[in-house]
Amino acid sequence: MANNAVADKVPTKAELEARFGRDIFNDFDYNDPRFNDQFNEVLEEHLAHCPVAWSNDGHGYWWISRNEDVRRVAQDWQTFSNAKGYAPNRPEGLPLLYPEECDPPYQSAWRKVLNPHLSPKVVANYEQAIIDDTNELIDRFIAKGGCEFIADFGSILPGLVFFKNVLGVPVDDLPWLVESAELANFAPNEERQIHIDKVWAYLDNFLKQRAKLPPRGDMVDAILAGVKYTEDQDSPWEHKVSVLVDITFGGINTTTYVLASAVKHLAENPEDRAFLAANPDKMVGAVEEFARMFPPIVGMGRSCTRDVEIAGTPIKEGDFVMIAYSASSRDPRGVENASVVDIHREPVPHYTFGAGPHRCIGSNLARLEIATVLQEWLKRIPEFSVKPGSKPEYITGFLRGMTKLEILW
């Protein structure tokens, strides 16, 4: 399938199968457990020799890796549409999530009213709450001399920040809601509907209850007010619920992965840890590098609306393509020493937060959250390491997650 290699020797089918367990150029599958275990190696092999790979999974899809191609596909929504969803082999009956799974003018109408509620100025108001929540969680385990970072901190903090502070969801509901959102993101396709339905029902009721209360001028009120798609077409109720579900799914697990990966890196690299502890003003730049190197979105899909060619490979109208954001930011064509974490890198080019009209709406909050947490963590726990004999555990689908990280201090 792939007629798009760079200059050096392209591995044969037999060599790929021996190394990766399958021909990752012509039979790639991001749900393959072996991809989870060889994540970096597969991404780098695609970048080196096959920037447009093919998957035989289900109806099939193309896997677009190279930096410039990722930018092109992400920005050209007219050719690469979101209107049929961002996941290949979409289960029948799975509701579309607005504004992610639609095109302008629907998408742009929603982003116009939502973006102001996640602007840098607005999210800065959450900084003290993030500081307080971070220290409250650390207080629970600091005296123990160690923790399992994901269970004790990483899976909790983003939910607190988003649900409690941004949406105002009752704190008692957070554990269940965070777990359900995680399963909706990481469960196999055939099980995702169950968890999406649970989250959908909860947030549908949450919106109905909020509609009975006086307006607060927040994002929830903006969603309740809805948008006009045309002069004669208002957004229906199910679209309003869909918007809240979409933002919920995007606001939790993604931040957890970048944060956990940053903590793992600092645990294993004492020079970087000491530098950032002594220079907290440099944390913002370091967070960009962590986001570049540890992208939580493995790939997001589009449907091709016309025949095109990408990196020498013909893509037909109706074909499904996956934008491999996870690969693009480590493309050596766009980043020098791309496979190395360099917290001093300036600038830090990456597409971890996407590109084009569907660029991550919560990127400002994610940046603030990760930087603030790491600054507070280093104040309280300046020396820490990965527990000897333990090994971080990961899960990979269209998102990348870390499920276990044991650290000691």
Name each model feature, range by range.
Residues M1-W409:
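Cytochrome P450
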